[in-house]
């Protein structure tokens, strides 16, 4: 999948310039699963390269890479073991681009029913805990680190892994035991296994002709008070 995209966005009152974004993309999606709705064998490889600005023009110039590998194995004829590893990196990002991020969401975010399930959607980092000068006054102060400031905050490097054991139950029901690990950072080299945020939990699925719907319960591996119940359509990956 190769394409060229031009986007223009209406500015908010807070922004003084129009937002114009031009992108050249090259995406590879190889899907060798035996069943896209309920896979038990096979793999998926997703590789994405998006180049913004540069010779194309626009407000911002940077490159975004994303690699996602998913594998599925049948165990004992009944169980399905599924694993995903997803890594992403943005090169050439400038702090000046952050003024558009609340509109475009081009950085990496984690949290929600398909990534870290013990975290609210997109809110592994928020403006209340990201140690970033969100108000642009040159200081990381109380206004930046107010815990009530629940606006999602992204970053330029991401590492995510998900592990699941899926099993059938009576009628159309199914169960999933899972563990999620991930983090986002301004430096990909800091995203080693010791720095990942881990959670674990279980899910109940209802298998429909259009695919499973699920209810997930997950809690943080270190602090059980950090937990979420999430709804999802299809499996997390």
Predicted regions and their residues:
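Outer-membrane beta-barrel "beta-signal"
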Residues: 25-26, 202-212, 226-237
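Repeated loop/turn-to-beta-strand initiation elements of outer-membrane beta-barrel proteins
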Residues: 1-2, 34-38, 76-81, 171-175, ...
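C-terminal outer-membrane beta-barrel translocator/porin domains of Gram-negative envelope proteins
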Residues: 17, 21-167, 178, 185-186
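Flexible, glycine-rich linker and terminal segments associated
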Residues: 5, 119, 235-237
């Amino acid at each position: 999948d190769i394409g060229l995209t031009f986007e223009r966005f209406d500015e908010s009152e807070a922004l003084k310039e129009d937002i114009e974004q031009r992108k050249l993309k090259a995406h590879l999606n190889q899907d060798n699963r035996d069943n896209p709705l309920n896979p038990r064998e096979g793999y998926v490889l997703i590789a994405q390269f998006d180049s913004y600005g540069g010779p194309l023009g626009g407000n911002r110039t940077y490159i975004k890479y994303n690699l996602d590998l998913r594998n599925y194995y049948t165990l004992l004829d009944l169980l399905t073991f599924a694993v995903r590893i997803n890594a992403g990196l943005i090169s050439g990002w400038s702090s000046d681009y952050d003024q558009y991020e609340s509109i475009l969401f081009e950085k990496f975010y984690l949290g929600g029913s398909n990534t870290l399930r013990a975290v609210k959607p997109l809110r592994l980092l928020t403006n209340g805990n990201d140690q970033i000068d969100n108000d642009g006054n040159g200081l990381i102060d109380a206004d930046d680190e107010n815990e009530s400031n629940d606006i999602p905050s992204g970053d330029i490097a991401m590492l995510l892994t998900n592990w699941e054991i899926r099993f059938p139950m009576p009628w159309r029901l199914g169960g999933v035991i899972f563990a999620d690990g991930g983090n986002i950072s301004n430096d990909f080299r800091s995203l080693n296994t010791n720095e990942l945020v881990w959670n674990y939990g279980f899910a109940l699925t209802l298998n429909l002709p259009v695919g499973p719907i699920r209810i997930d319960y997950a809690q943080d591996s270190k602090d059980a008070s950090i937990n979420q119940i999430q709804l999802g359509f299809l499996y997390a990956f």
